[in-house]
Structure formats: structure tokens, C-alpha cells
Amino acid sequence: ALLRAGAVIGSREIGMLAACGIAEIPVARRPRVAVLSTGDELVQPGQPLRPAEIYDTNGTIVTAAITENGGEARFLGAIPDDEPQLESAMREALADNDMLVLSGGTSKGAGDVSHRVIARLGSPGIVAHGVALKPGKPLCLAVCDGKPVIILPGFPTSAMFTFHDMIVPVLRRMAGLPPRSDAKVTAKIPVRIASEPGRAEFVMVSLVEGDAGLIAYPSGKGSGAITSFAQADGFLRIDTLADQMPAGTEAEVTLFTPHVRVPDLVIVGSHCTGLDLVTAPLARAGLVVRSIAIGSLGGLAAAKRGECDFAPIHLFDEKTATYNAPYLADGLELVPGWRRMQGIVFRKGDKRFEGMSVQDAVRAALADPACIMVNRNQGAGTRILIDRLLGEARPDGYWNQPRSHNAVAAAVAQHRADWGMTIAPVADAANLGFIPLAEEHYDFALVTARKQRAAVRAFLDALASPEGRAALTQAGFRPA
């Protein structure tokens, strides 16, 4: 046989057919897939954001994923949470396409209407509403007069994992394509990953080279952690009945790309925007730099295990009244970095914070039940400062624990929180109010055994260079 059923037709196959005098062959038509986003709060990328609005991430991602898997994607825009308007748009989409994919409106709240509309669009209607996946539980699957209708969860990571796990196999079958074959590697998990029994859980990971093979660091959990996709190399799956994946487990990692490139320089520890300034010359030189923000304490633990080159830290020792040096273990040495100001961040004009000291501002926030905070992840030096200020108090928002200063500022700027703690350069960049608390030492614990590696030397040179110091100063840091 020249070509078998199911073969993907490319330039090579077309040439073979032409050589045999064959001008036409029957092929599977690319299924037409309509994509609708739902929600009053959605704004298309490129448009300005108003308070309480967010960019429509899912529409863009789902459209691209459909194309990658053999479909002809037709993005029809975002529809408000208005039931008659949404029903009209869904009927029109189903009339002209082979499949309809929506995002949002699948939960059972008063404002989520997509799943209610499906019942009127054709039989048999909804076949599954809610699946044992995390993230992705609210997924809704339906068939309306022979056409698949899928309502993905509104949170981006939930939407993408459920799309690839549940929808891609059906879409590729409709397109006449073979099942997706993702590259996989085995890696060791350096930290315990807690899970929730009863649902299979997907956890995104970043891969680094350890002394005995690949190490897979969790790079962010949560339904809305879209930035984690940019940092992750792939994901692992925790079984439905498991309540954890213990540290040291050898796990199978499904890669997002066909190949993984192990980074030349690995930085694990505290987050700081100054890192981007220092590592920019390395990236321009073609080096792959991986920075994993897990906090100062987590970074120190990684450095002791030999899983990184540098661990950025900012830990104050009350006994010696010094930063960082007392926390070093054998095999680590301190590299001075820069000074940065930590403080309370808030929206300008908020009278609960404007003109106050840090202590008075925190008291005012705790006295107002409507005042919502945004915290930082456990193990972060910033989290230690926050907990010292709060004492035993656990205000609303305390368990919202992003991994970066940028995420804290974004939560406040977008009215998802009223206050948090971040560094002055990030507050300035977001045009937010700022109450200084303390200038801290942001330094690096260097793994001595890796000191002579070319990428390590390049980082040290960039840190000490006049250009690097000038860039840090201009951004609001004070080089050591």
C-alpha cells in the first residue's frame, strides 16, 4: 500500500502521490470547532482593563489548542452572562460547526448559565457535569443532536488540563488523526506534594538536573495559575486515591514539548524582579536560566541537596542581627546581592493605609472585616515578615498565597485584594501606594561544588558588572 488509512498527509506524502499520478484522495475534513468565552468580566487581549475585569485567556489558548490537534477553530468572542444572549450565540455556533467549546459558566452559581442553556439545545443534552480531576472538576460534557458541546472550567489551568485529558482524544478522532503521543521522562520529586483523595490531580513541574538525574519541582498549583505554564516543562499525575506524593518519589512527567532542555543555570529560592535584570545578559548569550520561586527556606534546602546553583535568600537572624550568613550550611557560600525595601502595598487613596505606619496600617486592616489581604507562599522570607506583623491573626485572604511579588501587586491593583506585602520597585511599577517596613539583604547561597561551572561564572560576572549594577540601581535596588 502506498498510504494507509489514518496517515497524515504532508509534503512527502503529496510527492509520493504525485509520482504515482494520483491527483486526489479522500481525506478526513478538519472538524469546525466554535469557541465561545462567557463572563461579564472578560476583556479581549489588547484592550484596557477596568477594575474587576480580566483578560480572556481561555479563548486564545483553546483556539490554539484546537488548531494544534487538527481542528478548524472559530473564535466567536466573549458573551456576557445573559441567558437569552448566550442561548442565541450557542444555537448559531452549533448550526454552523461540528463542535462547540465554551469556557466558564459550568459551575452551579446563580451567574453561571451555560449548563442551563444546554438542556434546551438538543438531545440527549448533558452526559456528565463534574469530573474527578484537579484542577478541572466543574467540566461539563454534552451532546446536542449529535454534536459535542463542552463547557470548560473558567480558570485557565483547569480549562487546559480538562481540554487535553477529555477533549483532545475526541477532536483528533474526528479529524482522522492518531492519538496524541506526548514525550515523557522520569524525574525525582524533591518535596512532598499534598493532594486531595477522590480526584486525580495534575501538578505542573519544572525540570532541573540533579546529581543523580532529573529533579521535578512543582511550579504552582491552583485552577488559575496560568503563569505556571510558562515556567513548567510538563506535569505529573497523582492518583485518585492518593493523599500525597512523598518526597523522593520517582514520577513520570509528561512534557509540554517534544524535548526538554535542561537549564544551564538553576536558581531556586526567593523571588525578586532584580533577578531578571541580572540574568538578562545570560539569556541574550544563549544560556537557559531556570528560576524557581519557592521561598528562601525552600531554596536553602534545595541548595543543600545540590539541586541548584544559587539559592536567593533574605533571612534575618535575630540573635546576631544579621542577614543570611547564619543560615548557611557546609558546602554553601554567601554571594552578596542587593538591598531592597519591603513594605505594605495598597491602592493609592485608600484611607485605611494612606499616611499610616506599617503597624497602624495592619491594625486598621485587621479592624475592618471587609479588608482583604493577599499573602505569600510558605517558606518565603516575605511570608515570615507578614506572620510577624499579624501575630495570631488570620484575616480574610490569608490563605491566598502566590509565589511572587508581582502576583501580590497584581491582586491589589485588580481589586482582588486590598493590601499585601511586596518590594518597592514592584509597587512603583504597578502605581500602587507603599509603606516602607525594612530594607533587607537579598543575597545568594552558592553551592561551592558548582562554583566553576561556566554559567555560574557568567552569573557572577553579570552581578558584578557596571551594567548589572546600573540596571539594579535604576530599578530601585541598592547593589551590595
Regions found by a protein language model. Name each.
Residues A1-P80, G210-K221, F235, E250-T257:
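Short, glycine/charged-enriched hinge/interface segments at domain edges or termini
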Residues V262-H271, V358-R383:
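Short loop->beta-strand "edge-of-pocket" segments that line small-molecule binding or catalytic clefts
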Residues T60-G122:
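N-terminal small/polar loop signature for handling phosphorylated ligands or for N-terminal nucleophile
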Residues P312-L328, A409-A438:
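A ligand-binding cleft/hinge motif common to bilobed small-molecule-binding domains
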Residues L332-G343, L432-D461, A480:
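Periplasmic-binding protein-like
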Residues L297-A311, Q401-A417, P425:
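Short helices/loops that flank or line small-molecule/ion binding pockets
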Residues V117-V262:
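Flexible glycine/proline-rich
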Residues L282-D360:
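N-terminal segment of the mature folded domain
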